[in-house]
Amino acid sequence: MTATATEHVAATSGATGRIARVIGPVVDVEFPADAIPSIYNALTTEITLNGETKTITFEVALHLGDNLIRAISLQATDGLVRGTNVVDTGSPITVPVGDGVKGHIFNVLGKPLDVDESEIQASDHWAIHRKAPAFATLEGSTEMLETGIKVIDLLTPYIKGGKIGLFGGAGVGKTVLIQEMITRVARNFGGTSVFAGVGERTREGNDLWVEMEEAGVLKDTALVFGQMDEPPGTRLRVALSALTMAEYFRDVQNQDVLLFIDNIFRFTQAGSEVSTLLGRMPSAVGYQPNLADEMGLLQERITSTKGHSITSMQAIYVPADDYTDPAPATTFAHLDATTELSREIASRGLYPAVDPLTSTSRILDPQYIGKDHYNTAVRVKQILQKNKELQDIIAILGVDELSEEDKIVVSRARRIQQFLSQNTYTAKQFTGVEGSTVSIKDTVEGFTAICDGELDHVAEQAFFNVGGLDDVERQWAKIQEQTK
């Protein structure tokens, strides 16, 4: 066990208490007065249910007084009864770390789900509750992480060593986009990746496992899952388990790490459930009163230190498409780039359904990405914004009533909107179209040509779901051939 893990180890390790009350996943345990376990300590008990013996793990959440502690169970509490003995492990939950975790799936407790535990050759075990790196060790980064997706690279460039949020309501393509990022970035990145499945569908976890195996990136990836059917305590802690594995690669092995989290909203939701179970007074919209603090404890650990980085991509569900909801609103402050997915764009069949006007990036600045890239991005946004302002007039009077200048703006905006769509590798099984990777140089050249009017003669359809300008020309040639 590392020094970090032993920081929390109480002198009362091995102390035994007895269950006093069970209310769903919340368990009150009575310990001897001189052996009260510390907050965050892991407790264990063994029970027999239907002839099968299983170990249940709890995490200490509150000291109630009168020698009672309140703990949250990380497994189903079926079969637990009052009077059952509970043992204090003397430390928080620990998970295996090191090269031995690559290529395997783990649960929140660090137990492998794909192989026997004896097959995991861990370098060490680290506690999941750790301090964020000291301020003096942090290192800012402005290096662009190229994804090969036009709309992202042009308008919301990602930062190597930064935190990236993929925001969107239900069914607009968050999980597909994060899977696409795993396929693209992890494959080109060549480093270590860690994936945290927080409160999402088990089917998606299985799909991800298969896709990563096919893409050849599984051998360099550790996956940690706490899915929808798990108790709230598990869903609240699984992101910390995955992050701890990523921190080991960053701090001990001095590697650059990719951390994918799907979904941060489920982390917040689990915190809300746990908060209610612990009897705390809810805050705005029913969320936990310590929402900002809880989010900060996670996000402040996802950072880059001198010489090595954690680049994080986080899917964030937006309930009812309401960006003022406290859960997504609290996350915004921690991110370096935000990619907002639009239901209106998705309804037009344009994927990835990134909203070019609301998505942002800290490095969308000429000193970081160059003048040509910046100027093209600004021109694209100006054309799209002008087109948006003209939509009310078009809806009432029609396009014919616009001035010639405005007609040109609308025409180019429609081509830009189509050209922002792109065929992806993940969606090939649905579309039958091979994915494409477009270099940032080709992306800037393509959109510059549209803004300059060099492609005004090309039909809009030729820009739909293609890669670079070469694909546009091929599509245009096909369309001309078909109309002869």
UniProtKB/Swiss-Prot annotation:
Gene3D superfamilies: 2.40.10.170, Bovine Mitochondrial F1-atpase, Atp Synthase Beta Chain, Chain D, domain 3, P-loop containing nucleotide triphosphate hydrolases. The keyword Translocase applies. Keywords: ATP synthesis, ATP-binding, Cell membrane, CF(1), Hydrogen ion transport, Ion transport, Membrane, Nucleotide-binding, Translocase, Transport. GO terms for molecular function: ATP binding; ATP hydrolysis activity; proton-transporting ATP synthase activity, rotational mechanism. CDD domains: ATP-synt_F1_beta_C (cd18110), ATP-synt_F1_beta_N (cd18115), F1-ATPase_beta_CD (cd01133). The keyword Nucleotidyltransferase does not apply. It catalyses: ATP + H2O + 4 H(+)(in) = ADP + phosphate + 5 H(+)(out). It is a peripheral membrane protein. Transmembrane segments: none annotated. One of its GO terms (cellular component) is plasma membrane. It is an enzyme of class 7 (translocase). Its EC number is 7.1.2.2. Pfam families: ATP-synt_ab, ATP-synt_ab_N, ATP-synt_VA_C. ATP binds at G168, G169, A170, G171, V172, G173, K174, T175. Its main location: membrane. It is found in: Cell membrane. Produces ATP from ADP in the presence of a proton gradient across the membrane. The catalytic sites are hosted primarily by the beta subunits. Belongs to the ATPase alpha/beta chains family. F-type ATPases have 2 components, CF(1) - the catalytic core - and CF(0) - the membrane proton channel. CF(1) has five subunits: alpha(3), beta(3), gamma(1), delta(1), epsilon(1). CF(0) has three main subunits: a(1), b(2) and c(9-12). The alpha and beta chains form an alternating ring which encloses part of the gamma chain. CF(1) is attached to CF(0) by a central stalk formed by the gamma and epsilon chains, while a peripheral stalk is formed by the delta and b chains. This is ATP synthase subunit beta. It comes from Arthrobacter sp. (strain FB24). The gene is atpD.
